[in-house]
């Protein structure tokens, strides 16, 4: 469980030394300077167009991806009462043609051809459109993007199609617990509030009616709400801010001036006099939760004082004496988070969300009593300046060493944030902590009382008496019982609860290490027989952070479902054992992960390097002697079984992909086998298994970042001395990939409890050779956009439609997937095959220039800049796992792609894609779609394990 992190900010008097103001444009419409981190070398220009559109321009001469986002201050909360989902449908329609670019899909094809991505989302109070693209094509993308907001066509033919896609999205997510929870929760809200409506829409709410065509409603909504003064635009590119400004003025000043009618955010979220409320919700998956949601005034204007962040840090604490630690000791909770929930201009919520065990749900009243006892304790003795000062120091460090984010992520976040914060604080707002304000914090704490509570209980065993209209959620809603209200409003205390102490992991030494290096890539250091360290001193990101990985590979990790389950439980027990100790480290920017994998388990420590050795030593001690108590084991065992059962309730396309990988890899086990093994596991079996797992191992480590060679060796020595000891060295090879037979497709039919059908078609590659991988990647690149355009936009087969290259242990392949509410698997497969044959003509007619563009775009993706140290570390770690010790896998793959000629690619497409006598697999499910009885007889895989065992293998990459 991870607390919702709320970073503090710097003191105003530190701005001169800790932040750098960016230049701004002044033309009678000036804005203040933008506060940026010292590590940020971009240029910024904030500007307002003549039509009122607010713009932020960002110049980054080094970026390989340009990006833009436009946010409109209108969303589903402004849907007409009789047209739920209208704003969402409008969002879809803007992608389907404008006066200047009338062809549906032309914008997306242009973006994808030039190595980009595009998307949009609709929220109750705003709608966000965004894209990224290879830097040199920004101008062309903006020309197309701007027309969304100037001259959208709303072609009647595409309205009918896209209404079907919106309905497919609705259908696909009918069993999504996230959407179902929100749908039920909204039954308690004031129907006038933007958050209360049915946001997605479906074929009924968006249907044409006599005298009321949905196209007319779309145009009316667009003309009323898509106004420049209600929009914010962020553009990031290599060009100067002045040139970017000139482009934006030229392209976006055609957006109609004026301001839209704002959503009714002045309406309280809950009708007056209805709180406190108790709501019970039955989920699809086996999930148990208690959400204590408190109605509060909006905290947006108090962002510089961070009252909610302060409160969240104490209520969400996971250290000794915390509410979470106490609940976990009782066996009642698996996780806890605290922080702001809904946030609007006038009203919001503060929420404490607790993931419960079965017994925890039964004892929700005692849990509530302890929560309110803690709130009283904080009010009486916990509002102190030292906590505030510590949070400010943490924020000062994080802001000083703020890492870059992808352009795609940055622009969409800033465009949305511009509605709520002064432009000068777009970066700084999450970090800003101006002054400790005890009275303000206490005023918000006073709102966290039972009288302001909407308690939501989620669990499969709850009793309910109502059914929500759109998603069919079973729920109940009533006034919080008077005895519960009286109990929680009393003055009870809990002596086992106490407030956190000062954080011992706060980084002190933040100096960048100096090291003489002959090469700028990891170098090998043999620590002992069977244990290798790879070391790379890297301060090129200007950050005192580092990533230390160690993988323990064992021949006993996953050869059976039992071993796989026990390895998983071992990692879970140790992580749980260390949670209270490591939580302060996490807050201080020093985290760890412990996870099992196909050959054993990996420990990763990441963050500021100053106190990593302290954390590592404690983790190693726990790995050596895990505390397998009955309470801990039972709780984690139940949690694992619950997770495995819930896999059968994932989206059909997710289940199809997961089953495909199980059919192809001999170290991945089916959930039913793992459930059986997990239910049979005992604490005694786990205790006996750990020495067996560790007795003979192969170990490899990576220290990458702000380390000297001596510091890296010291960390490795801790691993050798504290964990490995005199354990025997072993060689643990990779798992192997099943070699499919060249024949008619083998078909695996799943029984998935979901109304949608799904079909995944997988074409297996011939070898691990780079030349083969390059061709499969090119095929995925070339077909991605047209496959989507054909099967989703034109044929309306479903909401989840995608295709692309799919590696399995570096063996290339292609996968095509459609999840459909109205098409049976046979029809989906036929459409896929027809697409491939039709697209062969496009490849035959493809020009050298077009092919070169696809090839260049793919190379750009392969060679994309690694914006963060962690991205480079992840690549190094993957290359180490693959025994790719040149650390130049990207360069070699890019070279192989560049060597593929158009003639080579045409031959490959004919022999490896169109020839379905080649090895391929089909995974499907019929759902509630008709056609299962009429399906053509196929070469069915009845016993998947026997199928996998009967086939040959590709040699793994390390053999």
State each model region's role.
Residues 1-8:
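Bacterial N-terminal signal peptides that target proteins for export
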Residues 8-17:
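Bacterial N-terminal signal peptides
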Residues 23-30, 234, 389-539, 656-727, ...:
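C-terminal regions of mature proteins
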Residues 32-69:
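Mature N-terminal segment immediately following signal peptide/propeptide cleavage
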Residues 52, 70, 88, 129, ...:
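Buried hydrophobic packing residues in well-ordered domains
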Residues 67-132, 197-202, 212, 317-335, ...:
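M16/MPP (pitrilysin/insulinase) zinc-metallopeptidase core fold and M16-derived inactive scaffolds
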Residues 96-100, 132-165, 346-403, 555, ...:
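M16/insulysin-pitrilysin zinc metalloprotease superfamily fold
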Residues 109, 140-142, 152-197, 201-216, ...:
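Non-catalytic accessory/assembly modules
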């Amino acid at each position: 469980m991870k607390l919702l992190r709320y970073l503090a900010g710097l003191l105003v008097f530190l701005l001169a030394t800790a932040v750098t103001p960016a230049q701004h444009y002044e033309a009678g419409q000036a804005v203040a300077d933008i506060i940026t981190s010292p590590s940020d070398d971009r240029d910024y220009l904030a500007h307002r167009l003549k039509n009122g559109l607010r713009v932020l321009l960002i110049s980054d001469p080094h970026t390989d991806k340009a990006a833009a986002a436009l946010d409109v201050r209108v969303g589903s909360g402004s849907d007409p009462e009789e047209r739920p989902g209208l704003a969402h449908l409008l969002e879809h329609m803007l992608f389907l043609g404008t006066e200047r670019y009338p062809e549906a899909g032309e914008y997306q094809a242009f973006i994808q051809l030039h190595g980009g991505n595009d998307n949009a989302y609709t929220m109750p109070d705003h709608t966000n459109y965004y894209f990224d693209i290879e830097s040199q094509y920004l101008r062309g993308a903006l020309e197309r993007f701007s027309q969304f907001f100037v001259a959208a066509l709303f072609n009647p033919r595409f309205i009918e199609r896209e209404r079907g896609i919106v309905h497919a999205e609705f259908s696909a997510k009918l069993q999504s617990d996230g959407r179902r929870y929100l749908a039920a929760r909204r039954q308690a809200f004031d129907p006038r509030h933007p958050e209360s409506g049915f946001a997605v829409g479906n074929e009924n709410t968006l249907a044409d009616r006599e005298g009321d065509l949905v196209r007319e409603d779309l145009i009316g909504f667009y003309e009323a709400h898509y106004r420049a003064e209600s929009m914010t635009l962020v553009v990031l590119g290599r060009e100067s801010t002045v040139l970017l400004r000139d482009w934006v003025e030229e392209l976006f000043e055609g957006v109609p001036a004026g301001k839209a009618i704002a959503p009714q955010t002045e309406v309280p979220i809950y009708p007056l006099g209805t709180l406190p409320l108790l709501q019970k919700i039955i989920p699809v998956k086996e999930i148990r939760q208690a959400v204590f949601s408190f109605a509060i005034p909006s905290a947006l204007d108090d962002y510089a004082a961070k009252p909610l962040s302060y409160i969240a840090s104490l209520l969400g604490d996971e250290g000794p004496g915390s509410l979470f630690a106490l609940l976990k000791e009782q066996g009642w909770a698996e996780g806890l988070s605290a922080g702001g929930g809904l946030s609007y201009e006038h009203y919001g919520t503060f929420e404490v969300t607790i993931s419960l065990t079965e017994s925890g749900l039964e004892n929700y009243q005692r849990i509530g009593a302890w929560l309110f006892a803690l709130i009283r304790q904080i009010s009486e003795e916990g509002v102190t300046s030292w906590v505030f000062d510590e949070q400010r120091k943490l924020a000062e460090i994080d802001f000083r060493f703020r890492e870059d984010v992808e352009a795609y992520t940055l622009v969409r976040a800033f465009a949305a944030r511009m509605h709520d914060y002064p432009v000068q604080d777009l970066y700084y707002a999450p970090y800003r902590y101006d002054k400790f304000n005890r009275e303000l914090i206490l005023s918000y704490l006073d709102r966290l009382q039972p009288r302001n509570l909407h308690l939501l209980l989620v669990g499969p065993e709850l009793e309910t008496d109502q059914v929500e209209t759109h998603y069919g959620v079973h729920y109940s809603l009533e006034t919080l019982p008077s005895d519960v209200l009286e109990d929680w409003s009393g003055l009870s205390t809990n002596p086992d609860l106490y407030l956190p102490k000062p954080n011992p992991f706060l980084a002190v030494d933040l100096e960048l290490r100096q090291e003489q290096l002959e090469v700028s890539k990891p170098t090998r250091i043999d620590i002992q027989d069977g244990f290798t360290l790879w070391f790379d001193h890297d301060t090129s990101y200007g950050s005192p952070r580092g990533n230390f990985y160690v993988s323990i590979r064992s021949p006993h990790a996953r050869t059976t479902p039992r071993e796989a389950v026990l390895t998983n439980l071992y990692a879970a027990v140790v992580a749980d054992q260390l949670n209270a100790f490591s939580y302060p480290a996490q807050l201080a920017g020093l985290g760890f992960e412990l996870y099992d994998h196909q050959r054993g388990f990996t420990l990763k420590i990441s963050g500021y390097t100053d106190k990593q050795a302290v954390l590592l030593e404690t983790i190693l001690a726990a790995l050596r002697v895990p505390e397998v108590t009955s309470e801990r084991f039972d709780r984690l065992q139940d949690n694992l079984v619950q997770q495995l059962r819930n896999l059968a309730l994932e989206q059909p396309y997710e289940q199809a992909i997961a089953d495909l990988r199980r059919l192809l890899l001999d170290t991945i086990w089916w959930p039913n086998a793992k459930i059986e093994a997990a239910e049979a596991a005992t604490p005694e079996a786990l205790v006996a298994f750990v020495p067996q797992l560790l007795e003979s191992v192969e170990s490899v480590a990576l220290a990458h970042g702000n380390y000297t060679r001596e510091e890296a060796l010291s960390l490795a020595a801790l691993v050798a001395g504290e964990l490995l000891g005199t354990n025997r060295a072993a060689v643990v090879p990779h798992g192997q990939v099943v070699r499919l037979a060249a024949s008619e497709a083998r078909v695996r039919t799943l029984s998935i409890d979901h109304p949608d059908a799904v079909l995944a078609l997988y074409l297996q590659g011939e070898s691990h050779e780079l030349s083969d991988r390059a061709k499969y990647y090119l095929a995925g690149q070339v077909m991605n956009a047209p496959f989507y355009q054909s099967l989703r936009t034109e044929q309306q087969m479903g909401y989840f439609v995608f295709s692309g290259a799919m590696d399995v242990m570096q063996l290339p392949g292609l996968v095509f997937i459609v999840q459909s509410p109205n098409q049976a698997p046979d029809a989906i497969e036929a459409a896929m095959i027809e697409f491939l044959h039709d697209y062969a003509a496009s490849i035959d007619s493809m020009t050298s220039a077009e092919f070169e563009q696809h090839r260049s775009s793919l190379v750009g993706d392969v060679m994309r800049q690694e914006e963060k140290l962690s991205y480079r570390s992840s690549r190094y770690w993957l290359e180490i796992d693959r025994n790719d010790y040149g650390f130049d896998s990207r360069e070699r793959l890019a070279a192989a792609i560049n060597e593929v000629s158009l003639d080579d690619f045409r031959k490959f497409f004919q022999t490896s894609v169109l020839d379905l006598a080649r090895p391929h697999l089909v995974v499907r499910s019929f759902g509630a779609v008709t056609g299962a009885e009429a399906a053509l007889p196929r070469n069915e895989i009845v016993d998947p394990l026997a199928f996998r065992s009967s086939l040959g293998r590709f040699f793994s990459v390390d053999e």
